Amino acid sequence: MKSVKIMGTMPPSISLAKAHERISQHWQNPVGELNIGGKRYRIIDNQVLRLNPHSGFSLFREGVGKIFSGKMFNFSIARNLTDTLHAAQKTTSQELRSDIPNALSNLFGAKPQTELPLGWKGEPLSGAPDLEGMRVAETDKFAEGESHISIIETKDKQRLVAKIERSIAEGHLFAELEAYKHIYKTAGKHPNLANVHGMAVVPYGNRKEEALLMDEVDGWRCSDTLRTLADSWKQGKINSEAYWGTIKFIAHRLLDVTNHLAKAGVVHNDIKPGNVVFDRASGEPVVIDLGLHSRSGEQPKGFTESFKAPELGVGNLGASEKSDVFLVVSTLLHCIEGFEKNPEIKPNQGLRFITSEPAHVMDENGYPIHRPGIAGVETAYTRFITDILGVSADSRPDSNEARLHEFLSDGTIDEESAKQILKDTLTGEMSPLSTDVRRITPKKLRELSDLLRTHLSSAATKQLDMGGVLSDLDTMLVALDKAEREGGVDKDQLKSFNSLILKTYRVIEDYVKGREGDTKNSSTEVSPYHRSNFMLSIVEPSLQRIQKHLDQTHSFSDIGSLVRAHKHLETLLEVLVTLSQQGQPVSSETYGFLNRLTEAKITLSQQLNTLQQQQESAKAQLSILINRSGSWADVARQSLQRFDSTRPVVKFGTEQYTAIHRQMMAAHAAITLQEVSEFTDDMRNFTVDSIPLLIQLGRSSLMDEHLVEQREKLRELTTIAERLNRLEREWM
């Protein structure tokens, strides 16, 4: 029997006997998931996973091996669950396991594929669209936490969000659907709350998956929208009245949603920037994701630590409308203040007042630099934040009371004006150059790395979801490209993530080759439907993305991205060729995709080879230039350092003082130029050759670390030579 890994253990609150009893009573649960002592555990692929609803798989790595290394209590819940699972496996015969679908046998296996046909599962809600002829428009538009978010398009061109759990968790989606049904029945639908239709079976890669379907909100998340709105205000595109009036409009809309939920006795528990989407067409904010909802007075299933109200800690008061009001205000504070620039500051900590020093520091040009979460004076805005986030739950206003606060009552603008400003922000002149404005953080790369390791573990147990891993890899290539451009992630982490991606491609190729010997086994053959769906939902989006990449002008900094894209195309070809050899006639559609992949690979190879040859040529030129500087570099560097350390600096003065200052500077410049006079022509010729090369090399990160070091050395030498060449023009 394979060992069982424990992740996310916790102090004991249940006996071994009760754990056995719990499993025996609930062995028919469809997911291998347990709820013990208010904590949820997920069991899949021979692992017992403590379900952490805030960060999903990124936190599952906590506690791995602690049980078996003796570092945790022998009587902890996780150990009890492990003993229970071992006992269950020993006491359940192989024959019985094979006869029990979705029961104990699935506690030790991979997520089974549903046998239900495509379409609605059960009765959808009133007004649900017809799913006959639906297709996958976008696979994994988002992949956050425990869910895949894909886009399904009906034959009438209506776009629906399909929320698919990464592991066996039908119960979670069903519970979320039931919450929406209860709200619709009790309080009615709300224009600023997600519009859900029901559970359905949808295509996903080469599988069929059960998903919660809802209307797509085409737009941006809260942080992106308000960041762009703030930029428009700073650039003078809108005035202060329009900016703050729009903020107040958003606050009123979100508080109207929390009031609506309260009428149904439901608490959201996870309102945050990522769960508020602004509709591009209407400008309206829409609250999404009731996955962590609870009834009023109950302990929440989970929360996001940096936004939650203080009363939601373990063992404290239950969730309420007032805790949702807290979430709305901490969300607004996060977006207004720009807390993403400093992840050490949490929005639920509120504003910090500073009176002993300026609330804003100045940059080198004398302009104020905003410090997130810092306030220097009291205003209606700061009082609003403090009156919500700085008081206990008993003293905190509910939704309607919060809407009457002076900050939200004064200085408002009419709704149509606010919505027009938001629509312009999302679609008009105020839009940023790219709609993908969310920065890639170190935490995001760690989460993606954990997801890749999960796929690698599945490959080791011969349970790899080929469509899922290739779709995730396509998403990760985009994320890594963006992280390299932004420069906000340590280069060692980027290098490690890049290595993990390339390793995953090698594992996929080995996995496919290892399965080739099984192609005569009918159980491993892929149906024409699944092959076609794989091409449409996995291959097609990758081809379109890479083709756009190929149409762009590239620099040396793009070599790493092109290498990864080339590997992605190679792997797609390997997988598709293998699928084409599994006994089924090769369709014209398959031939078409194979030809397109091959053509894209050839074009990409040509561009990559050209760039690599140009880079090798640049390296040779760089080496020659650095060697040329050897005759003057040390003397020039020392002369310039002496000039900088001895020249008089005058910030202000009369015309007479300014003239004296200029005479002194000219004297110092003459001395410095005399020291390097024999190298003047060499330095001038050096800069003529080095500046075009530096432009070609750029400033971005490059795969060749030695080349980066040499580039920066050339940049320093060019700066020295340029400054010395300018001294005569500037001062003499």
Curated annotation (Swiss-Prot):
GO CC annotations, alphabetized: cytoplasm; extracellular region
Keyword Ribonucleoprotein: no
Intracellular or extracellular location(s): Secreted
Alphabetically ordered keywords of this record: ATP-binding, Kinase, Nucleotide-binding, Plasmid, Secreted, Serine/threonine-protein kinase, Signal, Transferase, Virulence
Keyword flag Nucleus: no
InterPro entries registered for this protein in UniProt: Kinase-like_dom_sf, Prot_kinase_dom, Rac1-bd_C, Rac1-binding_domain, Rac1-db_N, Ser/Thr_kinase_AS, Ser/thr_kinase_yersinia-type
Reactions performed catalytically: L-seryl-[protein] + ATP = O-phospho-L-seryl-[protein] + ADP + H(+); L-threonyl-[protein] + ATP = O-phospho-L-threonyl-[protein] + ADP + H(+)
Superkingdom, taxonomy of origin: Bacteria
Binding site for ATP: F142, A143, E144, G145, E146, S147, H148, I149, S150, K163
Domain Protein kinase: 136-408
The protein's enzyme class: transferase
EC number(s) recorded for this UniProt protein: 2.7.11.1
Active site per database record: D270 (proton acceptor)
GO MF term set: ATP binding; protein serine kinase activity; protein serine/threonine kinase activity
Chief location of this protein within or outside the cell: secreted
PANTHER family: OVARIAN-SPECIFIC SERINE/THREONINE-PROTEIN KINASE LOK-RELATED (PTHR44167), PROTEIN CBG02007 (PTHR44167:SF31)
Function: Acts as a virulence determinant.
Family indicated by similarity: Belongs to the protein kinase superfamily. Ser/Thr protein kinase family.
Protein name per Swiss-Prot or TrEMBL: Protein kinase YpkA
Organism: Yersinia pestis
